[in-house]
Amino acid sequence: MDEADFSEDTTYKQEDLPYDGDLSPIKICNDYSFTSKNDAFEVSSQIIFIADDPQEKAMHNETCGNTAMTMPLGKTTENAANKKDEKEKQCTAALHIPANEGDASKSSISDILLHHLSKEPFLRGQGIDCETLPEISNADSFEEEAIIKSIISCCNKNSWPKEQTLELTDQLNPKKDGENSNKPGSPTMTEENTSDLEETVAAGDSSHQENVNILTKTKGPGDKQNSYQGQAPPKQHTEKASSGNRFKYGQGQVHYQLPDFSKIAPEVKNPKNNIINKPLAIAKQVSFSKLREKPAVVQDILETMPESNCVEKQHQEQKGEITEPSQQIQMEPTVHIHQELLTGIESEASISKLSPTSQKGTSSSSSYIFQKISQGKQMCQKLKEQTDQLKTKVREFSKRIKQESPYHLQDKKLVLEKLQGHLELLEQNFLATKDKHLTLQQQVHKHESTIVSDFDPERKVEGEIFKLEMLLEDVKDKVDESKYTSAPSLPVSSPVTLDDLASTSSSLSNEVPEEHPGHPPGPRGSGGSEATGTPQGGPQEAPKEELCELTPQIYLNGHYGDATVQNQPDQVAMRLSSNSGEDPRCTPGRQDCAETTAPSPSCAFCRRLLEWKPKVEKKGHRRIHCGRFSTVHEKAPHSDSTPNSDTGHSFCSDSGTEMQGNKCQDCGTKIPTSRRACRKEPPKEFHYRHNTPGENYSNHSKRGAFVRPHSLHESKNSSPSLASPFCCPGLMYSPDTSKSSPTPGWQEAELGLENMKSQ
């Protein structure tokens, strides 16, 4: 070979392997770049050899010409490690070519490379020694073996010779066919070109310089893209793998100026026999293509088949891939490398085997938990439906309570108890289901980060149960109300007619008690009302023996009435309002009340009573104070009222004083029958005794002891009877006593009593 300088530019670019997508059969370009259609894997290396003296150049050229190029395995490993750490970076270095070289292709670098890169930064670099791993002495150490395992693909793919890549470039790049067809180192790729390849390898320095020139020209991006368009079949790869086991000095170095490895004795020498190396290239290409295609296949299988079958098939495929290249390995250095590769693939297989298993366990447990959670949601939906049904029943029952008669009270209670029992059971089921759901939700949060929805997020079921409970409370209240109103209630007050008043005993106001000196009369207000059927007790028993029929007289009961009003005003008001036939005209705070209703005018007595009314109105007196008792002389504002047979004789009475009268029936007077025995004593024995100190008995006449102005002679034919009584506590009606003396009043009273006695 000539002593001409040998320069070679290589650029190396790599991306991670092996699972980047589908891999088409690998194409070998003239710049040692192994690429796929999607540019996922590119390995481009340009090797620069720097020689300081002609002897080293000659040694290096001779080694290249004889195809006996060697490279330390340890250094290759180190270079490959650096390439993996600094991926997608390009490094070029160029040896200074002497000026006396005549060939332009030998002394120039590609314009494209010079456009992007310059030689000076690489010539002034520190070198690779400051960045790389130790030298050849540690090539067989454990750390380097681990590195070999991780980047074995890079080591094997970069072992193609320059001559082989030159011919492949001529075939794959149509643009370079016309240029390279005339050169002796670019024959067509056929089976007969194996001998031509050997001749080209042994040609000499000129062929090497031409090859380097061609390699340099194809470094541009456009040439790179053109080189990807074609695809060499596996058979051509096999034929061109003549020197695939040749390791170049400094191959795979990145970014640094490479030292001269020509003086270093190679540790591994590869024979020239091309047939031995053919199975290696085939095995590697097939293995990597399968590894690249494996992720998509595994993913499809995982989605379509059970996990257990998927794991077994995946493991079998990996074993098949492992055994296939191992059976084709025939060289000692490559056997060691492939053993490392086998170890890495087996570890990957074990990892992939474990990960689907763990994924299976996790997915199975999570699916079980999610199944339980879905069951909890279904149970919540069932609870809501049950709540709605129970609410419908409660509403129907509430309507039935209003419609049914009160005699079905016991049935209502039974139905209410059943509804309450259903409500309690529904609440218990709701709480139990909610607790289960919460427990499952906590388990999911421990294993996974999946967010699980709440059992009752909007608390709809809980709200419905609460409304149902309130509705049942209302129904219960209605049932209780119906229980109290179920028994027929007695009327509080019944209308008091005149017949009832006639049949009852005479009131205490019609009775004139015989009082002895020093014995004050008992309070009239302590007794009950005869109209309401309440018995009178205590001091009220004494008047039973007294006269009950003093027809023309209405006695002045001032002190009794006063005491009654003062002591029991509430009872007076109650009893007055209890009689529907009574028209209470006086209140406890009012001491003057006069009321009368005339019976049918067919009665002569009633006619005379009506004639007497205007006289009373004209001669009314106001008040005459006598001690603490007051006698009221006033007009009768209600005496002019129209005769009303429905209401009968209305009167004002306290709790212990009641007046009753007769009703004229068929123009006749009816004699009231007293329940008490009447005393036939002369009226002279009747006295008004007042225990009030300072009271003058002579003033009794002025207070008007009797208020019957009409003559009793006219009513002799009709038995003495009580007409409409006029009595209020402490009140009375009296004629004008200013013009008449009290004597005629007493005379009338005595005359009336005598008539009664004679009858």
From Swiss-Prot:
Polar residues: compositionally biased ranges: 181-192, 484-496, 639-654, 735-744
Residue segments, region Disordered: 169-246, 484-543, 634-654, 678-723, 735-759
Keyword Coiled coil included in the entry's annotation: yes
Biased composition (Basic and acidic residues): 679-688
Stretches with biased composition (Low complexity): 497-509
Entries under InterPro entries matching the protein: AKNA_Centrosome-Trans_reg, AKNA_dom
Ranges in a coiled coil: 371-482
Transmembrane intervals: none
Record's keyword terms, sorted: Coiled coil
Keyword Kinase annotated: no
Similarity-based family: Belongs to the AKNA family.
Official protein name in the record: Protein AKNAD1
Record organism: Macaca fascicularis (Crab-eating macaque)
